[in-house]
Amino acid sequence: MLEKAIELIDQLERNGFECFIVGGYPRDQLLGIETSDIDLCTNATPEDMGKLFVVKKEHFGSMIVEYQECNFEITTYRKEGAYQDHRRPDMVQFVTSLKEDLKRRDFVMNTLALDKNGTYIDLLGARNDIEHKLIRTVGDPYTRIKEDSLRILRAIRFQVVLGFKMDETLKKAILEQKKSILFLSKKRIYEELHKMFSKNPEEALQCLKDYEIDQVIDVNEFLNKGLTPDAIVFLGKK
């Protein structure tokens, strides 16, 4: 998958564009965690991409691109407008700067980028947060959570799965805005809970209590949909 991603990046560069690996992959590489989940971002617009590759799906500059029998999620550099539904922006504006694109992302640790040669590009302090195992938002946490309520559960999941600690201001923002997760679909809530409980059920349950999420939703309603055997055994003891 990585080799094909590098070839895709190389093809974009040969056509005058830039493209980087972003999101969880650079972070996990720095942590020594194996992952095959590769997301890309580029200054090429969806129109540009359509001239070079098979674009199977596109919305607001986020594309599913088929390349050598692999599907890649590729996003055009963008700024986002207001969020009315606590989940997605009402509009986006394409930009030409990687740094401008990274500013819209959720947590600083997820703003690390990687070029095709394996060189890290750190424009917002991601390496420092990763090295100190810190979860903090890009910008004001109250604003970032108000934009997208899923960030509450994502922050808790990263604490559980990666063993990172939460920034104190982010902790307060989560506790004060915890009820906003009710704006999320049950499907998205289940997906996040499943990821954290599958990794570390005891820590997941404790974190959900610490952040008072169990006061907002019936955690068991979601967990009964299916978990790993270890998680089911653990919950059965509660």
Region spans (language model):
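Catalytic cores of the polymerase beta-like nucleotidyltransferase superfamily
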Residues: 1-238
